[in-house]
């Protein structure tokens, strides 16, 4: 018999400060009325899921179905598992521990065509990596201004560019936090 012991220190990856432990909860569902899925996903998000999505699949015997996936913090997993079983026709779920890495983000509000639109800014080390107008704000503003969402998106991106909110630029002061 042999016992081997390794002594050392865990090496920290440079991006460990961006990672967090999460849980991925999934179920394959082949018999739910598809008109119910938008409400299921909305309910999961409102209940605290970090994200929820559907992927179409083909199950055994060629049956069309969906895999519903829910990303959540471990302390929310039990409630979200219960909600998934309650809102769908599934009789079981899978759960896997995962690590999620995400860039820090914040928001800046811009007034575009008389409407306030939040611009999401992903950043790292003081530099902007991505700029994205919040779509709910775009839809609301488009309706207020009687414009198409694509026109409002183009105006929002032009306003962000004019404000210097572009990839590679310094992160602006006064960025609203995601918390």
Segments the model singles out, each with a brief description of its role:
Residues 1-14:
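Mobile "lid/hinge" segments at catalytic clefts and subdomain interfaces of large enzymes
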Residues 10-12, 22-24, 30-179:
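Long, contiguous binding/interaction regions
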Residues 17:
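Condensing-enzyme catalytic core mediating Claisen C-C bond formation in acyl metabolism
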């Amino acid at each position: 018999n042999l016992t081997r012991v390794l002594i050392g220190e865990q090496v920290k990856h440079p991006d460990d400060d961006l990672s967090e432990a999460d849980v991925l909860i999934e179920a394959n569902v082949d018999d739910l009325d598809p008109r119910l899925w938008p409400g299921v996903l909305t309910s999961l998000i409102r209940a605290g899921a970090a994200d929820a999505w559907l992927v179409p699949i083909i199950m055994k015997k060629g049956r069309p179905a969906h895999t519903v996936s829910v990303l959540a913090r471990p302390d929310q997993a039990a409630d979200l598992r219960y909600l998934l079983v309650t809102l769908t026709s599934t009789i079981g779920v899978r759960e896997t521990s995962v690590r999620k890495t995400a860039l820090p983000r914040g928001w800046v509000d811009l007034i575009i065509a008389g409407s306030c639109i939040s611009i999401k800014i992903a950043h790292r080390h003081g530099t902007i990596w991505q700029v994205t107008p919040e779509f709910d704000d775009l839809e609301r503003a488009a309706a207020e201004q009687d414009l198409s969402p694509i026109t409002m998106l183009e105006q929002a991106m032009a306003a962000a560019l004019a404000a210097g909110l572009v990839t590679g630029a310094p992160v602006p002061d006064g960025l609203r936090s995601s918390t």
